[in-house]
A protein has these predicted regions:
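Residues forming the flavin
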Residues: 1-36, 66-240
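Residue-level recognition of phosphate/Mg2+-coordinating polar/acidic sites
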Residues: 47-60, 75, 80-84
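Mobile "lid/hinge" segments at catalytic clefts and subdomain interfaces of large enzymes
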Residues: 31, 42-49
């Protein structure tokens, strides 16, 4: 295959060709609320959402209308020992997401932002314990007041090596082991229409392990993705 892979790298990364769901709540996702605080994380989520809307995202948000129906779903979940986490969802769609990112990329270029593709970063330039820039495999050095390493899953091994080389402390995050389960539309219809993606959590009785529903794709299809380190993962797609 291609190296680097144009499906999992490039502008917007794997997100450009994914289902494109925006979870508009700090209660789900990563550790941003722990780092910046809940209110600041919520503020940044809304700021990012506004950018998506500016470049053409669907205005419809799931999970905020028909309160009585959502409460009925919550009651059913409780009876099944499940916890329903409230989370508004905006769905971009597999066939629309990359168009939004294309408009965003074109806007950045028109605004004078230089984007370098097919340019491998060899190292981070550190001076007096502070990241000052990056060095490419072509020997070019780029300096900036702030360096953001948006490496995703594809660049995790590279970034781990960089951290070890520069003595940067790291800690392992939670690793979720997931499976894709296909069911008929009729079974999921109520959840899909009211919530689009039902955030359901279950704790196992023996070891209290957390099990959660993640990345559902209503009326969609399962697809495999392969990363450069040989890792095969299962993704899903859903169209508008």
């Amino acid at each position: 295959g291609c190296q680097p892979c144009s499906i999992t790298t490039g502008f917007a990364g794997a997100g450009a060709f994914s289902d494109g769901k925006l979870s508009l709540s700090p209660d789900v996702g990563g550790t941003l609320p722990e780092i910046l605080g809940y209110e600041k994380a919520e503020e940044l989520i809304h700021e990012a959402d506004d950018i998506y809307l500016k470049f053409g995202a669907d205005k419809k948000v799931y999970g905020i209308e028909d309160y009585e129906a959502i409460e009925a779903i919550r009651t059913k979940a409780i009876r099944a020992n499940l916890k329903l986490i409230e989370c508004p969802i905006r769905h971009l769609g597999t066939e629309e997401g990359y168009k939004i990112y294309t408009r965003l990329q074109e806007h950045l270029i028109k605004s004078g932002v230089e984007i370098k593709f097919m340019t491998m970063v060899k190292n981070i330039l550190v001076e007096d314990g502070v990241a000052k820039g990056v060095l490419t495999e072509q020997g070019e050095a780029f300096y900036a007041p702030e360096i953001v390493a948006g490496i995703g899953r594809e660049g995790s091994e590279w970034f781990s090596h960089i951290c070890k080389e520069h003595g940067i402390d790291t800690k392992n995050g939670t690793v979720d082991v997931g499976v894709r389960v296909e069911v008929r539309d009729e079974i999921m219809k109520e959840l899909n229409e009211k919530l689009y993606e039902a955030k359901l959590v279950y704790y196992t009785p023996t070891f209290d392990d957390k099990v959660r529903v993640f990345c559902t794709n209503p009326s969609g299809e399962v697809a495999t993705e392969y990363y450069d380190d040989g890792l095969a993962v299962v993704n899903g797609h859903a169209y508008k």
